[in-house]
A protein has these predicted regions:
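Accessory, usually C-terminal, subdomains that scaffold auxiliary metal cofactors
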Residues: 113, 133-152
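Extended, well-ordered alpha-helical scaffold/bundle regions in very large, multi-domain proteins
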Residues: 120-126, 134-135
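Small-residue-rich helix-loop
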Residues: 110-117
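Short, solvent-exposed helix-loop connector elements
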Residues: 71-80, 104-110
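Single conserved hydrophobic/aromatic residue that forms the stacking wall/gate
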Residues: 159-167
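Conserved mixed alpha/beta catalytic, RNA-binding, or beta-rich assembly cores of soluble enzyme
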Residues: 81-87, 91-95, 99-103
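Internal, conserved structured core segments that host functional sites
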Residues: 6-75
Length: 167
């Protein structure tokens, strides 16, 4: 399937809009004042996010949830939980992509020849907050078997609820 660059750019902009909205909503849920900044980023969002509102929103969002010293690259139990949860979600999204007859390698924005899951990487973006919410509320001090098993529950529950609403 081939589609024009404008169409891909429009879809990517919508994905980023939903991602920032979901981040904002999670911050509001936890009564974080930084949610107002994400409102501003939503207003400033342009086609294809050429001004990198997604990046700015992510910095504000993660700092609001996990503190200003938090970085996604640090080897911490929180990051391990986030990475594990995101991987579970990505595999679920990829399973849905394949089961509907689409190819996972061809992405909307993600376009890396070494990433066999470019489309899944695009589509999972607005869903990451489900994992973020779980990790924020549990704040793991270690990341082992029990923490991995616990992360499977909210992911499975969300997947099941999506199918229930379709019926």
């Amino acid at each position: 399937m081939e589609w024009g660059e404008y169409g891909k750019g429009s879809v990517w902009t919508k994905i980023i809009r939903e991602k920032i909205k979901n981040q904002r909503d999670l911050l509001r849920q936890f009564q974080k004042k930084e949610s107002e900044l994400l409102d501003n980023y939503l207003e400033e969002l342009t086609y294809r996010d050429k001004t990198n509102r997604e990046g700015h929103a992510a910095k504000v969002y993660f700092n609001a949830l996990f503190g200003t010293k938090f970085t996604r690259s640090a080897e911490t139990p929180v990051n391990a939980a986030l990475n594990y949860g995101y991987a579970i979600f990505l595999s679920s999204v990829n399973r849905e992509i394949v089961s509907n007859g689409y190819i996972t390698q061809i992405g909307i924005f993600h376009d890396n020849m070494f990433n066999d899951f470019n489309l899944g990487s695009d589509l999972v973006e607005p869903l990451r907050m489900i994992v973020d919410e779980y990790v924020y509320t549990h704040q793991p001090e270690e990341f082992g078997h029990n923490e991995k098993m616990a992360l499977l529950d909210p992911v499975s529950y969300t997947h099941l609820r999506a199918h229930e609403t379709e019926a």
